[in-house]
Amino acid sequence: SAQALGRVDPVTRALIPALHPSTTFQRDADGSYSSGRAYSRPHNPTYDEAEDLLAALEGGHDCLLFSSGMAAANAVFQALLPGDHVVAPKMMYWALRKWLVDFAIPWGLRVDFADIQDLGTLEAAMRPGRTKLVWLETPANPMWTITDIRAAADIAHGAGARLAVDSTIATPVLTRPITLGADLVVH
């Protein structure tokens, strides 16, 4: 993975990016930050490198790092609007399912849990024009079932929805969902 970006530190010649856990950055004489970085929490060079690397490994355009997989998943669902329809798998990471039931549904998301490994069931769960997101895990936790990502993407896109794939278990070493038609990948 160190070679995926093909970057070499111009000062140290290191192939592995340096870690910048917390720092402030030098201001220009006029008080501005020409580097675009003022403090490492919102703009961290280590995060930038990691995000670029993950995007390259996944075959994606952009990447955002979060403090946890749950934070990343929550960001995907919270990008939707109350009233939007979501199709999620019956068998999925328990903590995320509980968050959907306890928080997302009361907030106003319309969530149908379906056996989306069965593509006919997935197609039947879609509400063309109203379904905004299909969320799938493959392999799915905890039974390691596999869903055909390309077919699920075709079904989602045919109904005007986006496909998000939780690929935590497979990682881009084994599966690259974006190359199979997914719109978002979460780890």
Which residues does each PLM region occupy?
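Short conserved active-site loop signatures built around small residues
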Residues: S1-L19
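A general structural signal for well-ordered alpha-helical segments in protein cores
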Residues: A18, Y47-E51, I149
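Conserved N-terminal alpha-helix of the aminotransferase class I/II PLP-enzyme fold
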Residues: T24-A71, A79, A95-A104
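Conserved PLP-enzyme active-site core in the AAT-like
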Residues: S67-H187
